[in-house]
From Swiss-Prot:
The keyword Metal-binding does not apply. This is ATP synthase mitochondrial F1 complex assembly factor 2. It is linked to Mitochondrial complex V deficiency, nuclear type 1: A mitochondrial disorder with heterogeneous clinical manifestations including dysmorphic features, psychomotor retardation, hypotonia, growth retardation, cardiomyopathy, enlarged liver, hypoplastic kidneys and elevated lactate levels in urine, plasma and cerebrospinal fluid. Plays a role in the assembly of the F1 component of the mitochondrial ATP synthase (ATPase). It comes from Homo sapiens.
């Protein structure tokens, strides 16, 4: 994960001093976050209207320039991000678009727009509680009673992650075969609320986004703590689907597309969390020293 961040930083520095140019163009808002915090309905595609992408540092952070125009959010706010690494990653999204801009592929831009505009008007406490609420319907806490092969598969693949989370955070996370789901102790919620409070609102937007993709807070925590890779987390979130596919077969192209899309969204969300937490974490460590 961090090697990927460094490659983005090093490979993208050319964007910082790239000369602006090309025909003038009016700015178009980028994509925005899907459920659970959907608020915008941008076009899915449009013809590319810029030639060059560059980054400049302003008073409020790092800005993205498309030719000589500054990128803005759907609510017409200046698109400004808190770190150079995140700016490079977003600029790379825009620079990698070909003749057609495919907004639905630009997940980092989506998350930045949501963080800047806050279309649902939620504060930090509300973001934290929205993320913790995923425990109530956490994918890996819902178990089947049959067939035995799937029961065993869920036990072998999901139990180690639950055990890791319980040990890592000092909490209790149970599983259940009931349609009502497991009963999550109040202490578990309190501990996770306290833990998530250490993140800034940008990172919390990313955490909720990843949890929504995986339908699991436990798997999201595993990703953040580098206990799981993106590929592992996605496969664990789709354990029953993959079991059924292996048993009954699938429409190959549809399955492959869905899997790749889920990986892309999850990877982007996880990268967003780390890039938004980086400066805060470093500052916290320096203060402690």
């Amino acid at each position: 994960m961090w090697r990927s961040c460094l490659r983005l930083r090093d490979g993208g520095r050319r964007l910082l001093n790239r000369p602006a140019g090309g025909p003038s163009a009016s700015m178009s808002p980028g994509p925005t976050i899907p459920s659970p915090a959907r608020a915008y309905a941008p076009p899915t595609e449009r013809k590319r209207f810029y030639q060059n992408v560059s980054i400049t540092q302003g008073e409020g952070g790092f800005e993205i320039n498309l030719d000589h125009r500054k990128l803005k959010t759907p609510q017409a706010k200046l698109f400004t991000v808190p770190s150079e690494a995140l700016a490079i990653a977003v600029a790379t999204e825009w620079d990698s678009q070909q003749d057609t801009i495919k907004y639905y592929t630009m997940h980092l831009t989506t998350l930045c727009n949501t963080s800047l505009d806050n279309p649902t008007q939620r504060n930090k406490d509300q973001l934290i509680r929205a993320a913790v609420k995923f425990l109530d319907t956490d994918t890996i806490c819902y178990r089947v009673e049959e067939p035995e092969t799937l029961v065993e598969l869920q036990r072998n693949e999901w139990d180690p992650i639950i055990e890791w989370a319980e040990k890592r955070y000092g909490v209790e996370i149970s599983s259940s075969t009931s349609i009502m789901g497991p009963s999550i102790p109040a202490k578990t919620r309190e501990v996770l609320v306290s833990h998530l409070a250490s993140y800034n609102t940008w990172a919390l937007q990313g955490i909720e986004f990843v949890a929504a993709q995986l339908k699991s807070m436990v798997l999201t925590l595993g990703l953040i703590d580098l206990r799981l890779t993106v590929e592992q987390a996605v496969l664990l979130s789709r354990l029953e689907e993959e079991y059924q596919i292996q048993k009954w077969g699938n429409i190959e192209w549809a399955h492959d597309y869905e899997l790749q899309e889920l990986r892309a969204r999850t990877a982007a969300g996880t990268l967003f969390i780390h890039l938004c937490s980086e400066s805060t974490t470093v500052k916290h460590k320096l203060l402690k020293e």
